[in-house]
Amino acid sequence: MTDFDPGESASIISVTEKVRSLAIGAPVSGVHFLGESAAFVGAEENIFVVTGEAEPATVSVHGGGILCATSDGARIVTGGDDGKVVSLNAKGEVSAIATDPKRRWIDNVALHPDGAVAWSAGKTAFIRGAKDQEKSLDVPTTVGGLAFAPKGLRLAVAHYNGVTLWFPNMAAKPEFLAWAGSHLAVAFSPDNKFLVTAMHEPALHGWRLADNRHMRMTGYPGRVRSIAWSAGGKALATSGADAVIMWPFASKDGPMGKEPAMLAPLKARVTAVACHPDQAILAAGYEDGTVLMVRTADGAEILVHRNGGAAIAALAWNAKGTLLAFAAEDGEAGLLEL
């Protein structure tokens, strides 16, 4: 690989010298913040927590592969191939939330602001409420993704040929949103008006929830593995191309009939995106190890990490937007204080 070549943007600003390099020493699949501590989720067994200037502290959470993880800033919830759902809080305390009775793999996890946790094993989605009441729902095929709605206790369960919307506290039959194909990651817009899935094919699909009108977002050269809502939820940033693709969601029709913005193009595929919590800025990671910060209004770029390494697996901002963490698949990682 060659050194980073900004092409026409030869005057690109670099902050690479301000990045604190971290050697996690193991493959990384995700990163989240617990308060001001960056927590790098390993592919196997452990989470590596970095607090202040200290070296990464290893916390054992599973007896095998870590298949999924999510966080609300107060705790990280993970699912593993040991059939367990585990929580790690900011104090470093590990607690078991659930163990699948059949020891099936825990493929997906989701967190609700009120403390409810959802997870899936095979074709079954589970919810444990804040009062420890557990409920389950079977869907036609293996669950591909889970997401809680921002308002009310409603869970979106993505699977083959559509998404099931489940109100676990209501007796009504779950609502089914149909669209042919395999639906994986799923996300509600912050204003609760839209639902979007990343599909097994190189495309996104969406529904306007007021009338279930379809929204088709295509044109990707590869599968979309990372999506992030902008601050305020007016746009959706996505990986899957050699630029960050941002779909507009400011109007009542969402992206229907509109072209997406294309930011930070490189000669490498975008593998991870993370939007700043308050400002119109995003971080983008690429398959060649590059990390950029991008101002969404005009596309201005700042180089955070040069290429020449493994693909970027994960990016995360802390809640204040003052720290950016990134990690490559091979465990090379970094922290940037803004």
Regions found by a protein language model. Give the residues of each.
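WD40-repeat beta-propeller superdomains and closely related acidic/aromatic-rich repeat-like regions
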Residues: M1-L338
